[in-house]
Design a protein with these regions (language model features):
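A detector for short metal-coordination/catalytic motifs
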Residues: 61-62, 72-110
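Histidine-centered nuclease catalytic patch
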Residues: 35-65, 74-84
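Short, charged surface segments at domain edges that flank catalytic/cofactor-binding sites
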Residues: 1-33, 91-109
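Generic anion/oxyanion-binding catalytic loop in active/binding sites
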Residues: 25, 52, 71
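Active-site/pore-lining binding-face segments in mid-to-C-terminal subdomains
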Residues: 68
Length: 110
């Protein structure tokens, strides 16, 4: 089946980062019930709450599941500026997003 005893290990090493990324993303979707954090439509992507070009990281508490429409509309705008102007804005969802991002800060110093 394999040409050498090391080949299965090489395949595992190649697959591990991809699988880890998939599981990482899946956990975030699961925590948000696969719904957009902004409008609660089905989520199809992850948005950087603090955009990458504004020093936003790709850690789990800076990533928010969102629908394509919200991700494209927000683009690289700061979440606080963009979200409050949306017709679907709710303070409850804003509080949930803010709480999510603060968990990341707590995790850093725990």
């Amino acid at each position: 089946m394999f040409s050498s005893a090391q080949e299965p290990l090489a395949l595992l090493i190649e697959l591990t980062p991809k699988l880890a990324k998939k599981r990482f993303r899946q956990c975030i979707y699961d925590e948000w019930n696969h719904l957009c954090g902004y409008c609660e439509e089905p989520a199809t992507s992850l948005d950087h709450i603090v955009p990458r070009h504004r020093s936003g990281s790709s850690n789990r508490h800076n990533l928010l599941p969102c629908c394509r429409r919200c991700n494209q509309a927000k683009s690289s705008t700061r979440m606080e500026e963009w979200y409050v102007r949306q017709d679907f804005f709710t303070q409850a969802r804003m509080d949930k997003i803010t709480s999510w991002t603060k968990q990341g800060i707590v995790d850093l110093f725990a």
